[in-house]
Amino acid sequence: MKQLLGIFILAVLSLFFVAPFSYAQSKAPAGNAESSSGQAVNLTAKAAVLIEGNSGEIILEKNKDTELVPASITKIMTLTLIMEALEEGKIQLTDSVSVSEYAASMGGSQVFLEPNETQTVDTMIKCISIASANDAAVAMAEKIAGSEPNFVKKMNEKAKELGMKHTQFKNCTGLDDDIKSGHFSSAYDVGLMSRELIMKHPGISKYSTVWMDTITHKTK
């Protein structure tokens, strides 16, 4: 589990801090990350953290509290709240989720859900986990909280509960996020919510270990 968590968080951070800042990578020299053993590790990522799953000990860090745009890594918190709702019995995997006009209008990564289309919670989680689907994420936010703004409020409450001091969410997708708009997170905070998702909700591995699947569109 320690190794899996480490690999997962490093993979997450490669997307979180390399892709959104790829334009800056060539301008910024590699820098050293500080490990718990005192050994310097040369990293080109703008920020990084490696956390031991069981204890929460920081094994390696570099600019861990720097606030940066999280992009689709935002969906780690979205998935955390979905798994939480499942385990609390508020929703079931077989429940139908209706897609609103707003959810269907999401751009970016999506599975092209149509207005009034219905899918099960199980399928929506697949779409979010495998395709990073913005439309499915918003549909699930509306299913759980009634609206995306209400769901985002829950995301920020959970972030506070987890001690994520350098995070603020403005949406449940990470779509069109801008640090100036107030949507940001940090390497350490990503580590905290990744640990919460993996350690507290192991059922997510059913979805996160799948790299491809198909869905059938269902419209009324």
Regions found by a protein language model. Give the residues of each.
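Short, linear, compositionally biased motifs with a strong N-terminal bias
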Residues: 10-11
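Positively charged n-region of N-terminal signal peptides that target proteins for export
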Residues: 1-7
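C-terminal segment of classical bacterial N-terminal signal peptides
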Residues: 14-23
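Extracytoplasmic
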Residues: 191-220
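Active-site-adjacent loops and short helices of periplasmic peptidoglycan-processing enzymes
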Residues: 24-191, 198
